[in-house]
Amino acid sequence: TEAEGDFDKAMEIIRKKGQAVAAKRSEREASEGCVLAKTTGDRAVIVALKCETDFVAQNADFVKLTQDILDLAVANKCATLDEVKALPMGNGTVQDAVTDRSGITGEKMELDGYMTVEGVSTAVYNHMNRNGLCTIVAFNKPVDEQLAKQVAMQIAAMNPIAIDEDGVSEEIKQKEIEVAIEKTKAEQVQKAVEAALKKANINPAHVDSEEHMESNMAKGWITAEDVAKAKEIIATVSAEKAAHLPEQMIQNIAKGRLAKFLKEVCLLNQEDIMDGKKTVREVLTAADPELKIVDFKRFTLKAE
């Protein structure tokens, strides 16, 4: 045999073969995996190890590898994913251990996520303990364990992008305003078109697309004359309404939509999932007026 009876040499040959196989599958999609989180009090960490199938993701050895990597990363206070990958593990590094496991399972694997938060106190949440979605959150002072977990659950459920409005970039706000303006203009034009069609005794739903026009003519619901008339109305009214939209009204509606967006994406502005009558900010203030969230992170394997 290649190893000539040498156990260590045999293990090295198996490892190299596994690494070669792993390299060949590097182009495949790794969309399943294991996400775990851990807190040491003033610091919390998320690690995500990806694979290709749920079968491997649920495997005890795969979960243990993820846990071991998380424990190492926490113990060494790693700042970046690259630092985690380079940590000593077994006979090599963390990255080597991932490659070895990939060779054993026959699936592409990648250490894909590494996130940290720091504060006076921190909390973690593993959604339904299914290792697919984890959150970590840091506070400016010690906080009741149940309340801290509630905030971590809020982050998991409602997927905020910032703590408050100050954390939302001007670029995102500007983009949302632009989208809101265009949406509002389109709605105003649509209302005018529908009103004009109804006035001409044409059902707007019958002529809202070329496909519907064709199929509804085939069913005998509308005539070719109706379609021609509808197209003329749609073109004329759309152009006229678009040219005379009240700018101030459009801006006011768009600003209202931006405010709604910020309420939905800012953690402190969101309705609390445990008490729908209060915002997260109000819940925290009621517990301690000086309590602040200083940072949070969220990692999920699934597209949302």
Show where each model-derived region lies.
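N-terminal assembly/interaction segments in proteins that build large macromolecular machines
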Residues: 1-304
